[in-house]
């Protein structure tokens, strides 16, 4: 049996004097597609940074409270080759960061081998890397974008390129952090359909979001976060009830399920 993707045992992450994750204990199994759902400020971003080892939790008695793929000590770059990551923040850094979108799509995908934003001067790019990058773009329906700069693309096109970047190392897990922020309705649907196919092809999904509509039918488990703690963990039908969502988001909601997706409205006024 493979090791769990993530094991946390009373993990606490502090920013300033405030815990953003507070004695968090949970296990995410391999091949169990999981959504982390909660409002802004619930600790979702801190959870991602903990998973990728950008943040380290407080250790009690010299024992690490976190294990990723069964290990508590990782080289960060080696770990990131096992975790493909797509986020709106990464999108913003590629398009509006230091390179101001000048990175070509093929170079952006190749940068996934180095866990960098673009290819560093000392990075050695092999023919095998170029082949795998081209295959990743093809898989995401973005081969025609290879020679274009990211800032010349629509948000949906750029997000597909970043999805190819996340998959170029054949990671064990795809981490999606608020993945459809900034996408219109059509682009969002197309993006999530590609994510569904990735899940069906065998890559474990970890989806971090505050949008219930992003929870694709392949998600088998939902973890509700509130104020840095697990408020509930269970299957989607058990987690996405009006009572549990009100407890986490602080507002009365109506929940409907259609086509395997969940849709919510604020109770009482019909607003989405």
Language model features: what each stretch is:
Residues 209-210:
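H-loop/switch region of ABC-family ATPase nucleotide-binding domains
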Residues 6, 20-23:
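Conserved structural motif at the start of ABC-family nucleotide-binding domains
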Residues 174-178:
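Catalytic Walker B motif of ABC-type/P-loop ATPase nucleotide-binding domains
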Residues 170:
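Conserved catalytic motifs of ABC-family nucleotide-binding domains
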Residues 222-235:
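H-loop (His-switch) and adjacent beta-strand-loop-beta switch element
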Residues 77, 88-152:
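ABC-family P-loop ATPase nucleotide-binding domains
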Residues 246-272:
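ABC ATPase nucleotide-binding domains
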